[in-house]
Design a protein with these regions (language model features):
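His/Asp/Glu-rich metal-coordinating catalytic cores
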Residues: 1-182
Length: 182
């Protein structure tokens, strides 16, 4: 298992939880570092998304370059994790890319995605004016949204409570790996 620091933390926790040795998990640095796996040279190209340290894979094999990206979000101000870097992508592709393989959840939407930075002030307004307790839900892996909610809650003078094992595990991993500072 080759992965960046945040995902390695989560993977090692899972391996330990199920009694498997965690030395199967290899932590790699982001691009331009590449790892050789069989005939492939693979680099982890930072790509903004709701999950910290998301990466597209730059795969060099037999003189060709392929780029494989899971879901992505072009966000210049993601709040957590690296912003999308068009210059880095231009540099990686300057000598040509044989194939770009990707998917995007909102590919058919006519609207540009919102940056996480634009969501915080709106959430803060809602939390500041709401009466009584406010409950917000999100995927535990959406660390950027968890941080946005926590920061907005704190600024609005509210107490923030995390519920759920996965939510706590993701926040712990974020703090341990430096993805979140507070």
């Amino acid at each position: 298992i080759y992965t960046r620091k945040f995902t390695a933390n989560i993977a090692k926790r899972k391996m330990d939880e199920y009694g498997h040795p965690d030395d199967a998990v290899t932590t790699v640095a982001p691009w331009p570092q590449q790892t050789t796996v069989g005939p492939f040279k693979v680099g982890f190209l930072p790509m903004s998304h709701s999950i910290p340290e998301s990466s597209s894979l730059v795969i060099d094999v037999a003189g060709d370059r392929l780029i494989h990206s899971g879901d992505f979000k072009i966000d210049m101000t993601p709040g957590v994790g690296e912003p999308y870097d068009p210059d880095l992508w231009a540099d990686v592709s300057k000598d040509g890319v044989k194939a770009l393989i990707c998917d995007s959840t909102n590919v058919f939407s006519q609207h540009a995605g919102r940056s996480e930075a634009t969501v915080g002030p709106e959430i803060e307004k809602l939390l500041g004016t709401a009466q009584g307790m406010v409950v917000a839900t999100t995927f535990a892996s959406n660390v950027a949204r968890v941080k946005t909610l926590a920061d907005a809650g704190e600024r609005a003078g509210r107490s923030v409570v995390l519920l759920g094992r996965a939510m706590k595990r993701m926040v712990e991993a974020s703090l341990e790996t430096g993805v979140m500072k507070d």
